[in-house]
Amino acid sequence: MKHFEANFDGLVGPTHNYAGLSFGNVASLNNAALVSNPKAAAKQGLQKAKALADLGMIQGMLAPQERPDLNTLRRIGFSGSDAQVLQQAAKTAPALLNACCSASSMWTANAATVSPSADTRDGKLHFTPANLVDKLHRSIEPTTTGRILTATFNDPHYFHHHNHLPEHNSFGDEGAANHTRLCQEYGHAGVELFVYGQEATNPNAPRPQKYPARQTLEASMAIARLHQLEEDNCVFIQQNPDVIDQGVFHNDVIAVGNQNVLFYHEQAFLNTQAKLDEIRRKLDTELFFIEVPTTKVAINNAVKSYLFNTQIITLPSGEMAIIAPTDCQENPAVYAYLNELLTLNTPIKQVLYFDVKQSMQNGGGPACLRLRVAMNEREVAAANQHTLLNDALFARLNTWVDKHYRDRLSTQDLADPQLVVESRTALDELTQIMKLGSVYPFQR
């Protein structure tokens, strides 16, 4: 049977804006209050996804969340018509309105953690939506995320969906952005790397001082239990607290893995050597640990360019390629390193550059925009076929974006009642295009 790694990218929602909501994410804070272009953002994301499909990859799309989130605004005491709720929130609590209008679900690396059937005791593909408790604007996503995932991977014979973890900082979970999987072939049992920022229940353990550690060891271990993983299939590794304090808010900003390659910055982890030895012990295959030294790429350049927030994909030819943002080309140190990387004797043979600037300005590169799902051909056939990107769906989604999305949106525009109407009309049509059923609160 054939095995693949599919990528499911987040469709950028109609309210994509720059409100600077993500403390600890330098790009997000630096670009707060810029005027955004939701139409361009959605098209950039679709273009990147289609390019991967054209390379022969299995590429899916995940629907965005309903925003503005009037349910949450009502839950915290705003009342009246939709227009009145928006007006009151804009006047008395603009920061809360901004949080309820975020299009952050576009970064599906935070949607969930996924364990493929080759690793799990029951032989099913497991999904757990991330609770994202560290950030208000993302903590309101998981229930709808769970519905969208269930509608996308909709055959219970193959797919096992869990509820998100308890909504408490002890179980802070940021999904696949802090998780990667190493293996020989996608269909073989692999080793899942769970990267955490702190131990919530151990006050003496190392933790960052300036910015929050969004992922806890307790959350990572809970996911491993839920997903029925054996100890031999897991390695728990702590992210270096010093790099979190330099703006590395998720592990996918400082490391990325694919099959038998782990590409990471020398400052990425604590106890690096011991953990690499553990991976070698648990995964009996030839491994390539590509460590990028600080002397070649400083942390600030890695964060600015999102060198590690790239995708490493295995092309149908068997060669690996890096999918990088054009920002990597524009940073001399990073561009020089990537050119050097291609001369080293590793499976990575090419670098392909994509413009995802609308996402980058909010602090998310190519890897943030996708959820990786290792699947066999039966599982691919059992998934919702209307979510898999081909020429027809690509054309249809582009037409849908042209019809419903604005080409400029400022934070002041978020209080416009018309935005609610536009957003709901768009999402209602999208659920019909992608055959998702009633996943949104306004449809229920």
From Swiss-Prot:
Alphabetic keyword roster: Arginine metabolism, Hydrolase
Q: Name one GO molecular function term.
A: N-succinylarginine dihydrolase activity
Pathway the protein contributes to: Amino-acid degradation; L-arginine degradation via AST pathway; L-glutamate and succinate from L-arginine: step 2/5
* Class in the EC hierarchy, top level: hydrolase
Record: residues binding substrate: 19-28, 110, 137-138, 214, 252, 362
Q: Which residues form a coiled coil?
A: none
InterPro entries found in the cross-reference section = AstB_sf, SuccinylArg_d-Hdrlase_AstB
The active site consists of 174, 250, 368
List this protein's GO terms for biological process.
arginine catabolic process to glutamate; arginine catabolic process to succinate
Does Zinc count among this protein's keywords?
Answer: no
In this record, what's one Pfam family?
A: AstB
Q: Which reaction does it catalyse?
A: N(2)-succinyl-L-arginine + 2 H2O + 2 H(+) = N(2)-succinyl-L-ornithine + 2 NH4(+) + CO2
Superkingdom, taxonomy of origin: Bacteria
Q: How does it assemble?
A: Homodimer.
Function (record text): Catalyzes the hydrolysis of N(2)-succinylarginine into N(2)-succinylornithine, ammonia and CO(2).
- UniProt family annotation: Belongs to the succinylarginine dihydrolase family.
Q: Matching PANTHER family, A to Z?
A: N-SUCCINYLARGININE DIHYDROLASE
| Protein's recorded name | N-succinylarginine dihydrolase
Record the organism.
Shewanella sp. (strain ANA-3)
